[in-house]
Amino acid sequence: MTLASAYLSPTAAGDLTEFATQYPASGEHWDKVDDDPFVAHDFDATYVGDVSSGSNKEDLYNLGSLPVGVGAISYIRVYCIVKANNSSITRTANISIKTGGTIYYGTSFYPNSAYNTETETWTTNPQTGLAWTIAEVNALQAGMRINGSVIIPVLTWSVTQIYVLVVFTLLEGLVGTVWQETTKLHWIDENGAEQSKEG
């Protein structure tokens, strides 16, 4: 059994677009957090965000699809690169996913004043309790919720990157890490050389 991985970045808006801020102001929220997982995120060059006051605020994003060659899915892990204008042990946020029409939340986390990587792992689909299927992952939405708070001072949150790592069993004939770049499938062969073809 050979384990492989794919990274899925936002490709379109999901079912919630509640954050009040995006920078730059042009374009869409999803294209502010779609930095290539193989390249360092762009910090404050592009981001979305909101403040931790009043009601909860949440953005969800549709993601790219899995490449060919995916067998059994071991787990998904959502990555969120986030900061607030001050550190806090009272204001929180959650990584979120939407599957089968229902939103599920990861463990609450506190912000740092510098960009920090938050992660949440789901080994099974929380709706079914079973291993993820290809169709479920391809329909997945991922994002983040800022939890409302009446505590002063108000925190301003910024999110610069969100993506999903999918770890799976590689189908026979493909060895090593597999990933998608536009419409092209890349993989590492048994000699350690990168190969590619249209997916």
What is each stretch, according to the model?
Residues 1-172:
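Disulfide-rich extracellular domains of secreted proteins
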Residues 172-199:
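Viral virion structural and adsorption modules
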